[in-house]
């Protein structure tokens, strides 16, 4: 649901009903709040990601990131981790180890917006060899049987989208001959 300017007439009750009906799930966990530094305005793929059936990775602010520990954003991420853990899942925290400046914008190096494919994971890169390498190593530990690739996506990230955003929900359509 995220940003209040989206899905104006769609509430949690309807969302939970639809998720259970159309996806056959039994439990829905709602995460509250939109981090100020979240360019996607509350998309879950920048906050928490499943890596196994019972394990969820949740982002964590650090003293090197724009979202500082004990900030509003940190409290949103910490609360998300708590809610997910209380729902019975294992939680791993994914540190935001820095930030970048690109086209007069500053944003955190949040590597959560990855794509998982058959035998591979592609994660956004931020052109910082140190944080990109550390993130790659962590993501490899989350997905030990997959090849992990970090791809620099600064212009895309600055526009509010990452790897998962660009590859999710590809519509099926047929080309019409003219």
Where are these regions (language model features)?
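The feature marks the mature, well-folded catalytic cores of soluble enzymes
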Residues: 1-178
């Amino acid at each position: 649901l995220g940003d209040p300017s989206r899905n104006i007439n769609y509430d949690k009750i309807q969302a939970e009903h639809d998720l259970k009906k159309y996806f056959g799930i039994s439990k829905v966990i709602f995460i509250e709040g939109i981090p100020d530094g979240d360019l996607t305005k509350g998309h879950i793929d920048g906050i928490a990601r499943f890596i196994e059936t019972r394990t969820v990775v949740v982002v964590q602010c650090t003293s090197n990131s724009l979202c500082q520990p004990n900030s509003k954003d940190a409290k949103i991420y910490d609360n998300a981790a708590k809610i997910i853990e209380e729902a019975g899942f294992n939680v791993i925290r994914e540190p935001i180890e820095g930030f970048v400046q690109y086209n007069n914008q500053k944003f955190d190096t949040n590597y959560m917006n990855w794509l998982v494919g058959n035998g591979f994971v592609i994660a956004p890169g931020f052109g910082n060899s140190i944080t990109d390498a550390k993130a790659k190593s962590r993501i490899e530990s989350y997905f030990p049987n997959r090849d992990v690739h970090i791809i620099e996506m600064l212009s895309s990230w600055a526009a509010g989208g990452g790897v998962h955003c660009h590859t999710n929900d590809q519509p099926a359509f047929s080309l019409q001959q003219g």
